[in-house]
Amino acid sequence: TTQEQIRKVTDIAQEKGWSISVEDENKTSIQFEFQRYTKYGQDFNFNADMQDEDIDTLIAGMKRYYEDFDPDYEAYLWIGDDGHGRNGAPYHIKDIVSDMEETEEKIYELLQALEVEFI
């Protein structure tokens, strides 16, 4: 059932170090928000949707997010006008990039765990 799938996704995400919230009031589109703090303490999150109670749509959405994830661009978003980290990001650009590269790996690990469980 859909509730069992939501529970499994939640359990797997938590095992991988992610916090998760699920917005399932609309049964045709259930939104999952995955959140974690990076090694350098940045609050990182992303969303993916499950359409029509089909777990494959959630995994496909997460896969698209992972494939489109650009650590350099994500790091750029955290660089202030002075060329250093802002809003809680590390001071040095190289550390911001490293943090986002590690975040990309964490997204991949979560995606892989869900694929093993559901595909």
What residue ranges belong to the model's regions?
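Acidic, proline/glycine-rich low-complexity IDRs
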Residues: 101-119
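Negatively charged, low-complexity tracts enriched in Asp/Glu with abundant Ser/Thr
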Residues: 1-45, 116
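Intrinsically disordered, low-complexity regulatory segments enriched in Ser/Thr/Pro
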Residues: 38-102
